[in-house]
A protein has these predicted regions:
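A short, surface-exposed alpha-helical micro-motif characterized by mixed small hydrophobic
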Residues: 195-197
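Catalytic Walker B motif of ABC-type/P-loop ATPase nucleotide-binding domains
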Residues: 154-157
Length: 258
């Protein structure tokens, strides 16, 4: 579980995140939307312990991040926008190295290879140097790490940017599997197709504040865009009307936050 309680961060007196209250339970994929500078990446950095909050608190499972960021990061697998691996090591060797940083037991190479292929890395790439890996292949190593360490949380920052449609589908399937495994998944993205594919809930951020949380159940890309535009486009559409299971129209379940 990921929990933020009145979490705030300012830089030079300018608020980047303002009193965020958020809970992402185990097994949920939660997607954060918003323009650049809205506070999305700041939120990830505070959960990861890469930055210290100005006030409030972030928790990963029961671990309070600020006093013990290393313990918190042991619970997390993190997919940044640009995954960096050791280029001279193979995918299997990279996985063994990073796993060894967070736990004493590292499975044998055969088990690591299985985890990598389960995460979607082509079998022929498992024992090749990572210098020849594409962005999507590097991401698969981190997703295998999430499985190997049984991470309680998976954080992703714009993971689909620069990927071709096939790689996006593969990545979304892997993220969905992590949620099904029981990880709390928090993904920052502008990719509405990915959001429609995997999110259980959506959060919209604006100027450091979480201004809306909506259920993603049954929402299309167009529905999500309409929801987003209500906060940023003065001429945006009204709340979309979506067909219910019985054919009647139904608006998306949502919480307006102010």
């Amino acid at each position: 579980m990921l929990t933020a309680k009145k979490l705030s961060k300012s830089y030079g007196g300018v608020p980047a995140l303002d009193a965020l209250d958020l809970e992402v339970p185990a097994g949920e994929v939660f997607c954060l939307l918003g323009p650049n500078g809205a506070g999305k990446t700041t939120t990830l950095n505070l959960f990861l312990g890469f930055a210290r909050p100005s006030s409030g608190a972030a928790y990963v499972a029961s671990v309070h991040v600020e006093p013990d960021p290393i313990a918190a990061r042991r619970q997390i697998a993190y997919v940044p926008e640009q995954v960096r691996l050791y280029p001279h090591l193979t995918g299997c060797e990279n996985l063994a190295y990073f796993l060894g940083l967070s736990q004493t037991h590292v499975p044998p190479a055969a088990e690591l290879s299985r985890l990598l292929t389960t995460a979607g890395l082509p079998e022929g790439a498992v024992h090749r140097p990572a210098s020849g890996y594409s962005k999507g292949m590097r991401q698969k190593v981190v997703l295998a790490l999430s499985q190997a360490k049984n991470a309680g949380a998976l954080l992703l920052d714009e993971p689909t940017s620069g990927l071709d449609p096939g790689a996006v589908r593969d990545l979304c399937a892997a993220i969905r599997r992590e949620g099904d495994r029981g990880a709390a998944v928090l993904m920052v993205t502008h990719d509405l197709g990915a959001v429609a594919s995997i999110a259980r809930r959506i959060g919209v951020m604006k100027a450091g504040r979480l201004v809306e949380i909506a259920s993603a159940a049954g929402l299309s890309e167009a529905d999500i865009l309409s929801l987003y535009r209500r906060h940023f486009d003065p001429h945006g559409e009204a709340t979309p009307q979506l067909p219910s299971r019985h054919g009647a129209s139904a608006a998306p379940a949502r919480e307006a936050l102010s």
